């Protein structure tokens, strides 16, 4: 917007002079080329929040092919909107716990589903929800490992306390903005966490502490 406003004023100013068209074009081109984000930084950040990315049994069956699973058309009608956002944040409400792939009530989606999510333009995932432990310790850890393999930032579940301490609150930086992202769940359908794994449960004392830590990161929003 700052670039646009500057150029509009410049064009109006030059149109009121008696300079030749060539001279006007030369000045406009020179000044336009000299503008940079360091002088006029981007002041807009587009955020998209989506939930819940799930796979019920019917969806898993529909994606099955002779060689695996194909989700390439899953986001066809929304992919453009997803990619318009600078940060497209989604709640991954399934585990990637491996075979057998199952829907409700204990979800485990094919790995190809995560690939499709990534290819659609989602670039941040939150993983703390009531299905985080549908495949227990192995499902939680495998889900994290697969997300990490795609280098997608994520928040909510952790292999151990050391990982949580290093990665949480999740600091996102884009277009000169800094955002601290927090994620919690009310529960995991009665399935207990197996140490040393961590699921961020709603706990006001812990949340208050996390908020203070996020403030120390000096974000523009949290």
Could you tell me what each predicted segment is?
Residues 1-4:
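Positively charged n-region of N-terminal signal peptides that target proteins for export
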Residues 14-15:
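C-terminal motif of bacterial Sec signal peptides marking the signal peptidase cleavage site
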Residues 6-8:
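Sec-dependent N-terminal signal peptides
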Residues 19-222:
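Acidic, metal/ion-coordinating pockets
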